[in-house]
């Protein structure tokens, strides 16, 4: 059984400006530098006419992991994320996937960015699946909680980025 991830954030900026803060190359590099963790890197960035695709790596030091994770996984975690965005109607829709080093499973999500005037909303809706007998469900819950915390930190970064520009 998968654990759900739901996150919504609202910004006081128009759609185009918010999209650049969420998915623009400069904003992504700055976000990774500030909150990406160990060995964070933008691995690929490919604009495509009406959207963009990018892949990034983020590290989580073992000393920052919950004890439940440390008992199942030795060492630091490396998370690789891939995000695609495509213009859709009056906004953008996308998909996100992520894998965690040494953990058999995946994180998948659908994303949307919609705007009305100077108000834009970002929605992430996804799930975590871990294929480890007996403890997979517990690990899914921990990962879903950590992903939600990461999305909250990213939302704070985007809001700050928007106010500083």
PLM-predicted stretches and their roles:
Residues 52-55, 84, 92-144:
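Beta-strand/loop substructures that line and gate deep hydrophobic ligand-binding cavities in soluble
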Residues 2-9, 68-69, 73, 113:
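General secondary-structure propensity
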Residues 42-96:
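Glycine-rich portal/gate segments that line the openings of hydrophobic small-molecule binding cavities
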Residues 1-62:
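Hydrophobic ligand-binding cavity/cleft-lining segments
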